[in-house]
Amino acid sequence: MSLLHPNAPQNVTGVLNADGSVSLSWDAVPKAKSYIPHYTDANQTDPHDANKMGYTETNSWTLSAADVPHLEAGDEIRFYIQTYNEVGQGANDIEKARYLHDGEFLGSAWSRPVLLIKK
């Protein structure tokens, strides 16, 4: 396990796609092996409420429309990205994210929030 605290991702951008999915991307972090996107329900402003997670080993991620929290026109949703120097383990992305998040691994600080507003 790496003892160095990885850098938080920079230049995170996101878009609510026409099909209802969300696409995020960010600058790759040197030596990062995985990233955990954290996100909130609609209109939650406190980062501590970003209790939903995804998992990716690249510097982009798409949340399927079926997994996006219900949003009405004008609703906001926030995303944060966290870097890990380890790869998650598990049968699916949720298990991989929980393995890192709940395990004894040192993730980065979270990125600045990406705020998306449903039109």
Residue ranges and their predicted role:
Residues 1-31, 73, 88-119:
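Pro/Thr/Ser/Gly-rich low-complexity, intrinsically disordered linker/stalk tracts
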Residues 27, 34-76, 86-94, 98:
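Recognizes extended acidic, P/S/T-rich segments that occur
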